[in-house]
Amino acid sequence: MKQLLRTASILLSLTIAISSVAFGQKTYAIALGGGAAIPVGKLADTQKTGYSALAALAIGVADMPLGVRFDGVYNNLPGAAPNGTTTNTDLRVTGALGNLIFAFPGTSAKPYVIVGGGIYNAKADVSGAKAKNYFGFNAGLGATFGVGPLAIFLESRYHSVSRKAADGGVFQFVPITLGLMF
């Protein structure tokens, strides 16, 4: 995990350095948000709607619709006791993600499409369970609403995390996030 964080930090630094040289007018934004994390597919059979949190660094160029965003995500999906059982297990999913964003033109409200991928770390809240890293992707829609020097954003993304069949197979969830960019 330390190697992964070190590599992600180096890549982020290189991306910022390269974009600084390549483009004159850069725009940066830090985003913080939270909301609901909704399990879908097979995951909805064992987990209930939980909560999500997001911290992000968005990098773009003025007057260009394409940008990049690096996200740190945290999702907690409470266990839903299957029929006939009395036990349930929470699932915690964190991630370090890189995304491309295409923002449509607008004045104070700008819709956007976001797509990306990265490393997800999942751990069931069970004694002896170990956290494991998996690759996954995400795609979604959102909108930013300018409020003076700040922006409010609302987005929904579909996350698909690829696990080995022995670990339970692929799972999906959809966070709906409301946040602030500054």
Where are these regions (language model features)?
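Transmembrane beta-strand segments of Gram-negative outer membrane beta-barrel proteins
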Residues: 24-36
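Generic short beta-strand segments
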Residues: 34-38, 74-76, 159
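Cleavable N-terminal export/targeting peptides
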Residues: 1-27
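Gram-negative (and chloroplast) outer-membrane scaffold detector with strong preference
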Residues: 53-127, 134-137, 145-148, 174-182
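A short acidic/glycine-rich loop-to-helix N-cap element
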Residues: 44-46, 163-169
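Extracytoplasmic loops and strand-loop junctions of Gram-negative outer membrane beta-barrel proteins
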Residues: 37-40, 82-83, 122-125, 160-162
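Surface-exposed strand-loop-strand hairpins of Gram-negative outer-membrane beta-barrel proteins
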Residues: 37-54, 132-133
